[in-house]
Amino acid sequence: LYLPRRTKLTLRLPRERLQDVSVLSGLSLQVNGHSIKIGGCKQRLLGLTTVLYSRYVVDSTGDDEDAFLAWAVWELKALRLRFKKVLAGKRCEFAGTDAPVATRSLLVADMPHEDAVLLQQQGLGPKRAMGCGLFVPHKTI
């Protein structure tokens, strides 16, 4: 993992945990022999948008994009979300603690704002503590 010097650390957590992480400001963390200095923190609300994107959603369907999309649609409907478009990206793998983790990116579009907030709160699929299945507003041109 190569991070530019000005990369911002973003933590998504409930409001009641803000005080817990504020003690990190000004500290330096050692990650794989490299020092990372933690700056000041800012509170930011979840995005009000109709298009959300997750860079990494765990894909346990093998190399079958259609099966992944079918699973994603089923999971989204299980959350009672309303949407019109779902697009999957290329499959990629990264090292997990026990075995490689296969993922795909996923875009969910044309959602009501309240459903988009719910998806940002809930996420999709396993390994969310590793950052998988977390959705952010998609930047459009």
List each model region and its residues.
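RNA-interacting cores
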Residues: 1-141
